[in-house]
Amino acid sequence: MLLAALHATPSLAGWFGSPSAQPKDGLTLATWNMDWLMTPRTHDELAPRCMSKQPASNEHAFPCTPGKPQPPTRTQADFDALAHTANQLRDEQQADVVGLQEVDGPDAARMVFNKGWKLDCFVNRAHPQKVGFAIREGLPYHCNGDLSALDVDGSTRAGADITLYPGSRNEVRLLAVHLKSGCFDGRLDRHFSPCERLRQQAPVVEAWIDQRVREGKPFAVLGDFNRHLDKDERYPAGPDEAAPINLMQAWSDNNPPGAVLLRATQGEAYVPCDADDHHKAYIDDILIDQKLASANKNRRFARLSFNPQDHGRELSDHCPVVWGLTP
């Protein structure tokens, strides 16, 4: 249990969608890291002044670090191929909401999510790698502001916080995250900067989870955890809640009672995004609490690989993870 107060930037927006909209049975959640998604105009503006290191959160810039891949230059055909996946999320998967990572705000997201979506609740960050949401049109929601405490050093990413069906019996709170990269396996207490930053972020997420449990409302945490949670959950968090040595048992510790989480990818074989995907384990995931799980005992997992015909296009190094939840 963490008692630390979390300060979220209050949203100036109220309800979006129709407060009287009737939810369908269940809820379908998805998450997608879109690999430096920005408009062509923004890319062209930033490319001549790219930086030799990763920009800070307050800098609208991207890196051109020697020896490392640069943000992709996308054509309209690339955006169209990505939009095909967004259409699959809307039509085939019936996704209600998609947590987005590495997207430079609503204008960039609209290049891909161009029909049937509201693009909102993006974090207040200058850096092009923003976290936000694509919400199915007509679904009522409220932006709760940034979980700014996740930016632990001025260069890591805040969380995006949204409530679906606010004020109704179907209310669900969601936190979208893109945690520090580089510490995919092993203990967090190593003298390695990515692990040190991730270890600082862990109690921020736990405090958010604990607050939701005390409120008694269903919730989920979804996004790019940059961590192989299947391995992580096998090991204890350690005695210090403010500095855990692993993530899952820190977050899912039943303290306070009810702080127990289920993972979308648990027991699921890794599905590659395309022919060049040589990963063996997921780092994108969806975690739901006991209330959401008990109300939706039928759960359908999907991973949307890209169309083989689009192999070689500038798409993303991630593809969507989907979890359909029904009673």
Report the location of each language-model feature.
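Active-site beta-strand/loop signature of hydrolases that rely on acidic residues for catalysis
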Residues: 29-34, 66-78, 85-109, 174, ...
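Structured beta-strand-rich core segments of catalytic domains in phosphoester-bond hydrolases
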Residues: 97-180
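Metal-dependent phosphoester/phosphodiester hydrolase catalytic core
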Residues: 43, 167-200
